[in-house]
Design a protein with these regions (language model features):
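Short, glycine-rich nucleotide/cofactor-binding loops
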Residues: 8-23, 46-52
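A glycine-rich helix N-cap at a beta->alpha junction
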Residues: 55-84
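A short aromatic-anchored loop/beta-hairpin motif
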Residues: 63-64, 72, 88-103, 109
């Protein structure tokens, strides 16, 4: 069932500036200022590699996890890119996202795609 207070951010753009100045900034502030009650960032494609390998991105993900932002990565992508273990060690949930994403879209859940 769709939760009108839960924002999902589908993060596919692996540019670090986009990550820091859009995805992360909005997600963190959305919880801080209570624009949304829940925020989940879905790591998809090359953003899995960026998250696993970029020290600054990893640090920011840790901070946001501690602040309540949820992170979940596409397992198929992470497996193919060889970064499943580093993502899990960071505290990121790693699951197959094809069906859940389809369900979110069919239920018209609030989703921001970057």
């Amino acid at each position: 069932m769709s939760d009108p207070d839960h924002l999902h951010i589908l993060w596919t753009n692996a540019d670090p500036v986009t990550a820091e100045k859009m995805v992360f900034m909005y997600a963190a502030n959305a919880l801080k200022f209570e624009w949304w009650k829940r925020v989940t960032i879905i790591i998809w494609g090359s953003t899995a590699t960026l998250t696993a390998e970029n020290a600054s991105i990893r640090s920011q993900v840790k901070e946001m996890l501690a602040g309540g932002v949820e992170f979940s990565a596409c397992k198929a992508c992470a497996d193919e890119l060889g970064v499943t273990a580093p993502l899990e060690e960071l505290g990121v949930e790693v699951i197959y996202w094809g069906e859940p994403l389809t369900r979110l879209l069919r239920e018209n859940c609030t989703m921001l795609s970057v």
